[in-house]
């Protein structure tokens, strides 16, 4: 492998880079923005492909781009490339960055006015070959296969090297006949017309029979069948033109002395600054620009106040983990703790990557250690794609190693790098919401919640018996036993033996789908389907909750300690893991019985506080729709009122079916539900569903206007944001693929609503936490739009009033926030209070 920046040896092989094609290809292949919202996917993709090639061919490199002036092809055939989509708005800006990268690397950059990059590359390739050099052409353009020879090969962007033998074996055409092949088949991407009606198979057959297009035309009267001959005769002009357009010129008047060609010394400082500016941390590492290890000044423990900490855990769950190592960094000095657990008491704060985890472990050990600054939280606010320290380190330059001191140094460096990038709104979110919230979550995780283990074990046994009964019924209907958990066996039973019509196929294997959605669509087709769905529901609850939950009770505390993930979702919502409490069914009887197993300690009660229809209230505020705001201000039922508007009735005449339809539309609008999906949900035809959605927007006209405005802002800025400035980048709003673009549109207008609701919940938690202390109450769980607390039995009424007051006044909206509060011995009882 050639050292990346070794310029000593004279070049024996030249690397020619099809710069324009490579840039255009990566522009659409990736989706990447900086934390400032600046699209950089083309620069990154180009750099990665180029870097891969430079590791093998680092000495003589020429990168060729199309010149702005029209080429002879444009002059010869005005339709040439005319059918291509217009140049994307951001392409020229990123192309300028690509060219700057090439210059910083010290590579020769070439543009020849009046000629296309293809012809410049072709001329250079053949000239280098004549001078006895090996040539590699880095491109994804198959046109270059015509240049292949013993000394000329094509290097694809994925690293595959293509030789004449490869082309012959894969396409059945030698390189010298490639132009003929392309002239017959045409190329829509380059508007090479070809012969209409001739595809690759026919072209191969013609070339196998006649050898070349030239010989084919000499013997045109002998071509069979007659219909094929007539096609060629009707498109002779196109065929001749296609030969000219497809052939890469190798005779341009270019003077290049390859033997004297040497790369300039790269501008390493400029390159480092360039990659840092674009936040290509992984490329800094791969280009070797992070520098060698600087001597670290070792200083004694404890560190000074404000130091950043790094630590290693034996496992990711801090309540269960052993603290293996603890270190701190301050102004480049490293402080190492010899007894990590004992050293926790010397710290004033947990500051650094995953600060919350260290705070949880410290609380377990009886040490009150508040988490403060965390570069991961800063990076997450800059771009919610930043969810893990490993990825953040790679993106912004560094490596999240298995060394506590290195982690501390990395935390210090990245925090100092990222913190100044926070805009005014994001800075407020960081200082007033996310940073103080990490302290709240640390205490919630350390506190945990008590479980009624015997109840869970009894329920598990009950489910096991019911699953056995369902299994027996399924076997009876199938006519024989089989493995219900085997998708292949289930597929055979349903579709081969019982003759059901499949609904969809799996993407990877193309097998008939037995997934949940497919089976739900088959409900009613056969009694066995309903039994299988029931069996699966019980099996999932048993394996996900009933059996694992008792094993997750901590032996020291006797409680369950879930982890709350602050940087896991694109909308800002919290998620939980180990276990994930978000997926416990809310409305099913079994889900409710699982909630009954979450209980209070003796002398305490659980308090459940749930925001009522918070996302619809947020939508009313963001859209400013007067009808929507009036419903909430007057305390009316939003679904009944929506139904009244949609059906043109007095609210008193709205029946349950109408209300259900309105409720489905109300929440469906938030998630971009299509008329097709609505028709399935409500069991109505497509036209009726379409009319429902239209009547909804007629009832709430400013909602539609807000959606359109949000999408337009997303396209213009590259991101959408919540009421408080939390961002989500949506580059796919500009996608040329309709399904991708429509999915991005749904995400784009849902995020401000869902994200604002998440922000309101977080603000409420931060405000509530210090006010619970005088009552002796504790926050335990945050699930969906709900908080669960543990309160002393004799302070329950005070706690109910306090929680309701704080949550409903988290932030002033144009409509009131409403919170339903209840208490009980267990979670279910509290919800039903």
UniProtKB/Swiss-Prot annotation:
InterPro entries: 5-3_exonucl_a-hlix_arch_N, 5-3_exonuclease, 5-3_exonuclease_C_sf, DNA-dir_DNA_pol_A_CS, DNA-dir_DNA_pol_A_palm_dom, DNA/RNA_pol_sf, DNA_polI_H3TH, DNA_polymerase_1. The keyword Metal-binding does not apply. Keywords: DNA damage, DNA repair, DNA replication, DNA-binding, DNA-directed DNA polymerase, Nucleotidyltransferase, Transferase. It catalyses: DNA(n) + a 2'-deoxyribonucleoside 5'-triphosphate = DNA(n+1) + diphosphate. One of its GO terms (molecular function) is 5'-3' exonuclease activity. Residues 412-833 are annotated as: Polymerase. It holds the Pfam family Taq-exonuc. Residues 173-267 form the 5'-3' exonuclease domain. One of its GO terms (biological process) is DNA-templated DNA replication. Its EC number is 2.7.7.7. It comes from the Bacteria. In addition to polymerase activity, this DNA polymerase exhibits 5'-3' exonuclease activity. Unlikely to have 3'-5' exonuclease activity due to absence of a 3'-5' exonuclease domain. Belongs to the DNA polymerase type-A family. This is DNA polymerase I, thermostable.
């Amino acid at each position: 492998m050639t050292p990346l920046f070794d310029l000593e040896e004279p070049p024996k092989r030249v690397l020619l880079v099809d710069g324009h094609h490579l840039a255009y290809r990566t522009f659409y292949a990736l989706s990447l923005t900086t934390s400032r919202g600046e699209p950089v996917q083309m620069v990154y993709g180009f750099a990665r492909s180029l870097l891969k090639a430079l590791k093998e061919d680092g000495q003589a490199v020429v990168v060729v781009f199309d010149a702005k002036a029209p080429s002879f092809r444009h002059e010869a055939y005005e339709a040439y490339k005319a059918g291509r989509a217009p140049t994307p708005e951001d392409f020229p800006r990123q192309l300028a960055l690509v060219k700057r990268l090439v210059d910083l690397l010290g590579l020769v950059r070439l543009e020849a006015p009046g000629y296309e990059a293809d012809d410049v590359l072709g001329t250079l390739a053949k000239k280098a070959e004549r001078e006895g050099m090996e040539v590699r052409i880095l491109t994804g353009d198959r046109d270059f296969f015509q240049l292949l020879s013993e000394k000329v090969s094509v290097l694809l962007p994925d690293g595959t090297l293509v030789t004449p033998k490869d082309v012959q074996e894969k396409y059945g055409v030698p390189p010298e006949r490639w132009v003929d092949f392309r002239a017959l088949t045409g190329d829509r991407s380059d508007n090479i017309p070809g012969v209409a009606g001739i595809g690759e198979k026919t072209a191969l057959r013609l070339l196998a029979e006649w050898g070349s297009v030239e010989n084919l035309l000499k013997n045109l009267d002998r071509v069979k069948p007659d219909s094929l001959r007539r096609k060629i005769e009707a498109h002779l002009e196109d065929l001749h033109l296609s030969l000219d357009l497809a052939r890469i010129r190798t005779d341009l008047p270019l003077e290049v002395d390859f033997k004297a060609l040497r790369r300039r010394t790269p501008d390493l400082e400029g390159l480092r600054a360039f990659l840092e500016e674009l936040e290509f941390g992984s490329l800094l590492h791969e280009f070797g620009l992070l520098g060698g290890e600087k001597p670290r000044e070792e200083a004694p423990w404890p560190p000074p106040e404000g130091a950043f900490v790094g630590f290693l855990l034996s496992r990711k769950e801090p309540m269960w983990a052993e603290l293996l190592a603890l270190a701190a960094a301050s102004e480049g000095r490293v402080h190492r703790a010899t007894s990590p657990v004992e050293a926790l008491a010397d710290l004033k704060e947990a500051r650094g990557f995953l600060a919350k985890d260290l705070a949880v472990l410290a609380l377990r050990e009886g040490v009150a250690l508040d988490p403060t600054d965390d570069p991961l939280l800063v990076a997450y606010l800059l771009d919610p794609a930043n969810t893990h320290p490993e990825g953040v380190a790679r993106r912004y330059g560094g490596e999240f190693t298995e060394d506590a001191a290195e982690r501390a140094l990395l935390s210090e460096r990245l925090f100092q790098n990222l913190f100044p990038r926070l805009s005014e709104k994001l800075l407020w979110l960081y200082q007033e919401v996310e940073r103080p919230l990490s302290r709240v979550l640390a205490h919630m995780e350390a506190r945990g919640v008590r479980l009624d283990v015997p109840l869970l074990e009894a329920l598990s046994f009950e489910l096991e018996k019911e699953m056995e009964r369902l299994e027996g019924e399924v076997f009876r209907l199938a006519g024989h036993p089989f493995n219900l958990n085997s998708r292949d066996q289930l597929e055979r039973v349903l579709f081969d033996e019982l003759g059901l019509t499949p609904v969809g196929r799996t993407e990877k294997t193309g097998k008939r789908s037995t997934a949940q959605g497919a089976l739900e669509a088959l409900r009613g087709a056969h009694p066995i389907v309903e039994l299988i769905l029931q069996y699966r529901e019980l099996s999932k609850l048993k394996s996900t909750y009933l059996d694992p939950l008792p094993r997750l009770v901590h032996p020291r505390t006797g409680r369950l300690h879930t982890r709350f993930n602050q940087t896991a979702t694109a909308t800002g919502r919290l998620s939980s893991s180990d276990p994930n409490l978000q997926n416990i069914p809310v409305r099913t009887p079994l889900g409710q019985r699982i909630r009954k197993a979450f209980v209070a300690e003796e002398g305490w009660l659980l308090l459940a506080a749930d925001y009522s229809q918070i996302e619809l209230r947020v939508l009313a505020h963001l859209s400013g729709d007067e009808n929507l705001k009036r419903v909430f201000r007057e305390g009316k039922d939003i679904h009944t009122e929506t139904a009244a508007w949609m059906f043109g009735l007095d609210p008193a005449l709205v029946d349950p079916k109408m209300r259900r339809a309105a409720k489905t539309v109300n929440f469906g609008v938030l998630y971009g539900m299509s008329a097709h999906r609505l028709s399935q949900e409500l069991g109505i035809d497509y036209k009726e569903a379409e009319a429902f959605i239209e009547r909804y927007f007629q009832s709430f006209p400013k909602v539609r206007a807000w959606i359109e405005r949000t999408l337009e802002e997303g396209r213009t800025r590259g991101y959408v944001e919540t009421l408080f400035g939390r961002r989500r980048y949506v580059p796919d709003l500009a996608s040329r693929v309709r399904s991708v673009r429509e999915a991005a549109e749904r995400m784009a207008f849902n995020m401000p609503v869902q994200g604002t609701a998440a922000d309101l919940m977080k603000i409420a938690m931060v405000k509530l936490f210090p006010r619970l202390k005088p009552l002796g109450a504790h926050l335990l769980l945050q699930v969906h739009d709900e908080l669960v607390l543990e309160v002393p039995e004799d302070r329950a009424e005070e706690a109910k009033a306090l929680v309701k007051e704080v949550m409903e006044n988290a932030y002033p909206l144009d409509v009131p926030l409403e919170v339903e509060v209840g208490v009980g011995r267990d979670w279910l009882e509290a919800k039903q209070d």
